[in-house]
Protein backbone atom coordinates (compact mmCIF):
# COMPACT_ATOMS: atom_id res chain seq x y z
CA UNK A 1 0.00 0.00 0.00
CA UNK A 2 1.03 3.59 -0.44
CA UNK A 3 1.61 3.85 3.32
CA UNK A 4 4.07 0.96 3.25
CA UNK A 5 1.80 -1.15 5.45
CA UNK A 6 0.50 -4.57 4.46
CA UNK A 7 -3.11 -5.73 4.44
CA UNK A 8 -2.76 -9.48 5.04
CA UNK A 9 -4.98 -11.80 3.00
CA UNK A 10 -6.68 -8.84 1.32
CA UNK A 11 -9.83 -9.67 -0.64
CA UNK A 12 -11.55 -7.47 -3.21
CA UNK A 13 -15.17 -8.55 -3.55
CA UNK A 14 -16.66 -7.99 -6.98
CA UNK A 15 -19.51 -9.01 -9.25
CA UNK A 16 -19.84 -9.18 -13.01
CA UNK A 17 -22.78 -8.80 -15.35
CA UNK A 18 -22.89 -9.51 -19.06
CA UNK A 19 -20.39 -11.42 -21.18
CA UNK A 20 -16.82 -10.49 -21.97
CA UNK A 21 -16.51 -10.14 -25.74
CA UNK A 22 -13.96 -12.31 -27.59
CA UNK A 23 -11.82 -9.18 -28.13
CA UNK A 24 -12.25 -8.18 -24.46
CA UNK A 25 -13.18 -4.68 -25.61
CA UNK A 26 -16.51 -4.20 -23.84
CA UNK A 27 -15.39 -3.79 -20.22
CA UNK A 28 -17.15 -1.26 -18.01
CA UNK A 29 -15.75 -0.86 -14.50
CA UNK A 30 -17.97 0.47 -11.72
CA UNK A 31 -16.02 0.93 -8.49
CA UNK A 32 -18.09 1.49 -5.37
CA UNK A 33 -18.53 4.74 -3.49
CA UNK A 34 -18.22 5.48 0.23
CA UNK A 35 -20.87 3.40 2.07
CA UNK A 36 -21.83 1.84 -1.28
CA UNK A 37 -21.54 -1.70 -2.54
CA UNK A 38 -21.88 -3.64 -5.76
CA UNK A 39 -25.60 -3.91 -4.94
CA UNK A 40 -26.00 -0.12 -5.04
CA UNK A 41 -24.16 -0.03 -8.39
CA UNK A 42 -26.88 -2.16 -9.99
CA UNK A 43 -28.95 1.00 -10.45
CA UNK A 44 -26.37 2.34 -12.91
CA UNK A 45 -26.96 -0.30 -15.57
CA UNK A 46 -29.70 -2.40 -17.13
CA UNK A 47 -31.39 -3.58 -20.30
CA UNK A 48 -31.57 -0.92 -23.03
CA UNK A 49 -29.69 1.60 -20.87
CA UNK A 50 -26.39 3.33 -21.64
CA UNK A 51 -24.59 0.61 -19.69
CA UNK A 52 -26.29 -2.60 -20.77
CA UNK A 53 -25.24 -6.15 -19.82
CA UNK A 54 -26.34 -7.26 -23.30
CA UNK A 55 -23.50 -5.15 -24.75
CA UNK A 56 -21.05 -4.66 -21.89
CA UNK A 57 -19.08 -6.77 -19.45
CA UNK A 58 -19.70 -4.88 -16.23
CA UNK A 59 -17.40 -5.32 -13.27
CA UNK A 60 -18.48 -3.81 -9.97
CA UNK A 61 -15.65 -3.80 -7.42
CA UNK A 62 -16.21 -3.13 -3.73
CA UNK A 63 -13.77 -0.72 -2.05
CA UNK A 64 -11.64 -1.90 0.82
CA UNK A 65 -13.42 -1.05 4.04
CA UNK A 66 -17.01 -1.36 2.79
CA UNK A 67 -17.75 -4.67 4.52
CA UNK A 68 -17.71 -6.88 1.41
CA UNK A 69 -14.02 -6.45 0.60
CA UNK A 70 -11.45 -6.65 3.39
CA UNK A 71 -12.62 -4.22 6.08
CA UNK A 72 -11.99 -3.38 9.74
CA UNK A 73 -14.81 -5.79 10.64
CA UNK A 74 -13.55 -8.83 8.71
CA UNK A 75 -9.78 -8.34 8.41
CA UNK A 76 -7.08 -10.56 9.86
CA UNK A 77 -6.80 -10.19 13.64
CA UNK A 78 -3.56 -8.19 13.37
CA UNK A 79 -5.33 -5.39 11.45
CA UNK A 80 -8.90 -5.72 12.67
CA UNK A 81 -10.91 -2.82 14.07
CA UNK A 82 -8.92 0.25 15.06
CA UNK A 83 -5.72 -1.42 13.79
CA UNK A 84 -6.98 -1.37 10.21
CA UNK A 85 -4.44 0.52 8.08
CA UNK A 86 -5.16 3.69 6.16
CA UNK A 87 -6.06 2.74 2.61
CA UNK A 88 -5.97 5.31 -0.16
CA UNK A 89 -7.89 5.52 -3.40
CA UNK A 90 -4.54 4.81 -5.06
CA UNK A 91 -4.37 1.51 -3.12
CA UNK A 92 -7.90 0.56 -4.15
CA UNK A 93 -7.23 1.28 -7.82
CA UNK A 94 -3.86 -0.49 -7.76
CA UNK A 95 -5.51 -3.64 -6.36
CA UNK A 96 -8.42 -3.35 -8.80
CA UNK A 97 -5.87 -3.21 -11.62
CA UNK A 98 -4.30 -6.43 -10.34
CA UNK A 99 -7.75 -8.06 -10.17
CA UNK A 100 -8.61 -7.08 -13.74
CA UNK A 101 -5.24 -7.89 -15.31
CA UNK A 102 -4.05 -10.88 -13.29
CA UNK A 103 -7.32 -12.65 -12.48
CA UNK A 104 -9.66 -11.61 -15.30
CA UNK A 105 -7.07 -11.16 -18.08
CA UNK A 106 -8.34 -7.71 -19.05
CA UNK A 107 -5.96 -5.30 -20.77
CA UNK A 108 -8.35 -2.51 -21.78
CA UNK A 109 -11.32 -0.80 -20.11
CA UNK A 110 -13.87 0.97 -22.27
CA UNK A 111 -15.33 2.97 -19.38
CA UNK A 112 -14.68 3.57 -15.68
CA UNK A 113 -17.72 5.30 -14.19
CA UNK A 114 -18.92 6.20 -10.76
CA UNK A 115 -20.22 8.85 -8.45
CA UNK A 116 -18.64 10.35 -5.36
CA UNK A 117 -15.64 8.27 -4.25
CA UNK A 118 -16.22 5.89 -7.16
CA UNK A 119 -15.82 8.90 -9.44
CA UNK A 120 -12.60 9.79 -7.64
CA UNK A 121 -11.42 6.26 -8.43
CA UNK A 122 -12.27 6.85 -12.09
CA UNK A 123 -9.91 9.84 -12.03
CA UNK A 124 -7.25 7.65 -10.40
CA UNK A 125 -7.69 4.96 -13.05
CA UNK A 126 -7.06 7.52 -15.78
CA UNK A 127 -4.00 8.89 -13.98
CA UNK A 128 -2.49 5.58 -12.85
CA UNK A 129 -3.23 3.49 -15.94
CA UNK A 130 -3.88 5.88 -18.86
CA UNK A 131 -2.91 3.30 -21.47
CA UNK A 132 -5.61 0.94 -20.19
CA UNK A 133 -8.57 3.31 -19.79
CA UNK A 134 -10.44 4.58 -22.83
CA UNK A 135 -13.01 6.82 -21.08
CA UNK A 136 -13.94 7.92 -17.58
CA UNK A 137 -17.27 9.21 -16.35
CA UNK A 138 -16.86 10.59 -12.84
CA UNK A 139 -19.93 12.38 -11.52
CA UNK A 140 -20.41 14.20 -8.24
CA UNK A 141 -16.66 13.68 -7.77
CA UNK A 142 -13.52 15.75 -7.74
CA UNK A 143 -9.98 15.03 -8.76
CA UNK A 144 -8.83 16.62 -5.50
CA UNK A 145 -10.59 16.71 -2.15
CA UNK A 146 -11.33 20.20 -0.85
CA UNK A 147 -10.22 21.34 2.62
CA UNK A 148 -13.90 21.76 3.53
CA UNK A 149 -14.47 18.04 2.97
CA UNK A 150 -11.54 17.13 5.24
CA UNK A 151 -13.08 19.26 8.02
CA UNK A 152 -16.47 17.60 7.49
CA UNK A 153 -14.91 14.12 7.68
CA UNK A 154 -13.06 15.02 10.89
CA UNK A 155 -16.47 15.65 12.46
CA UNK A 156 -17.71 12.23 11.37
CA UNK A 157 -14.53 10.60 12.67
CA UNK A 158 -14.85 12.42 16.01
CA UNK A 159 -18.39 11.08 16.45
CA UNK A 160 -17.18 7.52 15.88
CA UNK A 161 -14.09 7.72 18.07
CA UNK A 162 -16.07 9.31 20.94
CA UNK A 163 -17.74 5.94 21.52
CA UNK A 164 -16.38 4.34 24.72
CA UNK A 165 -15.85 1.02 22.93
CA UNK A 166 -14.06 2.54 19.91
CA UNK A 167 -10.76 0.74 20.54
CA UNK A 168 -12.23 -2.62 21.52
Model segments located where?
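Ligand-binding pocket scaffold of soluble enzyme catalytic domains
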Residues: 1-168
Amino acid sequence: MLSGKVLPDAVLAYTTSGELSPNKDNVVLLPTFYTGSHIRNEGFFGAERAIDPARHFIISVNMFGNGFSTSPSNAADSVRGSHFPDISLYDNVFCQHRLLTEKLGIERIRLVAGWSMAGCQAYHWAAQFPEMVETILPFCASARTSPHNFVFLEGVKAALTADQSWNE
